[in-house]
């Protein structure tokens, strides 16, 4: 009798879990800002970098690129080479404005525009469409030697392999030199 009750309960639990609908998300990626963390060395000096954290969902799970994804539309000179697009925004008169960040190039004796854009690896090993969700941490430089005491933000969006673009998220205000800010 006890065995029949146990088997009946196991069957009931199995049926309950097998009837669950799979998670569904839109095919366009969606991201949500989770936070920013400054990276500080053991001696309490600022590294000049931080971690931007955000969560993501994608209905068909086609997020990320392989190293071999070098042909159009993912070629180096193509508009979709990067699957994480990041805009640098500087606080000017109390408002955050998209600003190109420049870096001196000693070879050309001119300034180059710095890009914060990135390529992140595929998040699934298969091309079979399946909804995914998770969290991503991205290490990013925040210190600007040409303007060492700025307040900035980043705007971030991602693209999937089908070139669907996510919503845009924005970080909170970030100090390019948080150690100096604490001393003021």
Give the location of each predicted region:
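Positively charged n-region of N-terminal signal peptides that target proteins for export
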Residues: 1-5, 10
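First exposed extracellular module after export/assembly in secreted or surface-exposed proteins
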Residues: 30-184
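C-terminal motif of bacterial Sec signal peptides marking the signal peptidase cleavage site
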Residues: 15-18
């Amino acid at each position: 009798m006890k065995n029949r009750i146990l088997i009946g309960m196991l069957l009931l639990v199995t049926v309950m879990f097998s009837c669950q609908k799979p998670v569904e998300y839109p095919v366009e990626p969606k991201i949500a800002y989770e936070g920013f963390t400054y990276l500080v060395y053991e001696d309490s000096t600022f590294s000049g970098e931080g971690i931007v954290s955000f969560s993501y969902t994608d209905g068909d799970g086609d997020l990320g690129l392989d190293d071999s994804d070098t042909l159009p539309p993912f070629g180096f000179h193509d508009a979709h080479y990067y699957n994480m697009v990041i805009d640098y925004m500087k606080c000017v008169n109390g408002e955050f404005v998209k600003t190109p960040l420049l870096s001196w190039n000693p070879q050309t004796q001119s300034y180059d525009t710095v890009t914060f854009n990135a390529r992140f690896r595929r998040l699934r090993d298969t091309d079979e469409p399946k909804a995914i969700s998770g969290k991503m941490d991205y290490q990013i430089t925040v210190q600007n030697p040409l303007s060492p005491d700025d307040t900035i933000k980043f705007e971030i969006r991602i693209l999937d392999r089908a070139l669907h673009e996510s919503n845009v998220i924005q970080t909170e205000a970030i100090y390019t030199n948080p150690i100096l800010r604490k001393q003021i």
